[in-house]
Amino acid sequence: MTTTTRFAPAPETEAGSMSMFAALLAVAVMVMAGVVWDGSTRMRDANKAAYAATEAGRAASQAISAEAIAGRDADIDPSAGAVAARRYLAAAGVAGTVAVSGQRVIITTSVTWTPTFVPTGSQTMTGRAEARTVRT
């Protein structure tokens, strides 16, 4: 004699279903992940603009005039300083403006940020830096 064991079939109403809570939780987690991702890329691009402005200002302020080497005012050579700053910005892939005046250089940069998940549209992140030469 052979015995067979039979299991009761699952009720038809529960086949392949998931709770409403689990579905809403999954959607909420995906939305939060998208917001975190887009927030981090926005901060990255804002930092890129600020860092590029700072470093371009440093590059420009190193282009001092020949009179500064001779011991007079530590003025920045306007053409050499602007060229050095623009070269740095081009190498960094950042758009920007350069203004050199006497011992000061002002750099303004802009980076376009485009979100990946949140449909808010592109935004421009700007950075601004001012560098001065100081005789010590």
Task: List the model feature ranges, each with a label.
Residues 59-111:
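Short amphipathic secondary-structure patches
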Residues 22, 46, 79, 86, ...:
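Alpha-helix boundary/capping detector
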Residues 38, 112, 120:
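Residue-level signal for pocket-adjacent positions within structured domains
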Residues 10-17, 106-115:
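Short secondary-structure transition/capping segments
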Residues 3-5, 115-136:
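Low-complexity, S/T/G/P-rich flexible repeat/linker segments used as non-globular hinges
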Residues 23-33, 99-112, 132-136:
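Hydrophobic transmembrane alpha-helix bundles
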Residues 2-76:
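Alpha-helical assembly-interface signal, strongest on the long, hydrophobic N-terminal helix that forms
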